């Protein structure tokens, strides 16, 4: 099994939107988009398989594809209400509001960010269509005389989706090149439905 890794240096503006509906072979609709926080690092790992068909002692055909996608997102900080929304925690009360970390699976979300394109000097915006986040570990440390930065890191696992475009093919993310960071952020806002404050559909 082959593994493809990607580490991003020069990135930011992580946005998230809850998956409202997904119709296999047609479209996916997002709702309640928001900016997750300030990003430090993003990484993903795409697991691919390759099967060779032999005949007459030679390779006659090769079939390859992506089996799964996973990654991490390190943030400088994240507000508790946004973390609860991302992970699907329930809540009660108002002042103070109590968030209950339950054993339920986190909701499916679409999410994206921009990264610096060193080759062109511009930016590439990436949108992952359908994924689930988890917080598998956390470290809390007392204050000391020296400054020690401790950033929260979230794990995620993505799934392949089948939409009307590209027809008959599975896709897990889109990437678009832009000349400016502002243009990349504007595209991410549209994907997450942040600009109009409502839902957005991709087909």
At which residue positions do the language-model features occur?
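Polar/acidic, low-complexity leader/linker segments enriched in S/T/G and N/D
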Residues: 1-43, 199-203
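Mixed-charge, glycine-accented linear interaction segment located at domain edges/termini
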Residues: 131-203
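Beta-strand elements of well-folded, non-transmembrane domains
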Residues: 75-79, 115-119, 132-135, 158-162
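Oligomerization/assembly interface segments of phage tail-like spikes and tubes
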Residues: 59-83, 147-161
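Short, solvent-exposed beta-alpha or beta-beta edge segments that form flexible loop/patches at the rim
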Residues: 47-62, 140-142
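Short helix-loop boundary/capping segments
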Residues: 100-136, 141
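Surface-exposed ligand/attachment interfaces on beta-rich extracellular proteins
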Residues: 53, 57-59, 95-97, 199-202
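Charged, amphipathic alpha-helical segments
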Residues: 78-102
């Amino acid at each position: 099994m082959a593994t493809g890794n990607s580490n991003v240096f020069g990135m930011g503006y992580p946005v998230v939107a809850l998956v409202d509906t997904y119709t296999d072979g047609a479209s996916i609709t997002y709702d309640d988009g928001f900016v997750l926080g300030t990003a430090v690092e993003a990484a993903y790992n795409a697991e691919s398989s390759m099967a060779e068909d032999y005949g007459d002692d030679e390779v006659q055909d090769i079939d390859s594809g992506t089996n799964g996608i996973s990654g991490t997102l390190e943030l400088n900080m994240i507000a508790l209400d946004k973390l609860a929304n991302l992970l699907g925690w329930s809540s009660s009360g108002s002042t103070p509001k109590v968030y209950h970390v339950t054993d339920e699976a986190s909701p499916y979300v679409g999410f994206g960010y921009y990264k610096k394109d060193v080759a062109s000097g511009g930016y590439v915006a990436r949108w992952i269509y359908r994924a689930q986040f988890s917080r598998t570990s956390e470290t809390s440390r007392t204050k000391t005389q020296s400054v020690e930065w401790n950033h929260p890191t979230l794990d995620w696992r993505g799934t392949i989706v089948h939409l009307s475009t590209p027809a008959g093919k599975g896709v897990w993310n889109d990437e678009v090149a832009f000349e400016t960071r502002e243009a990349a952020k504007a595209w991410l806002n549209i994907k997450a439905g942040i600009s109009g404050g409502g839902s957005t559909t991709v087909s």
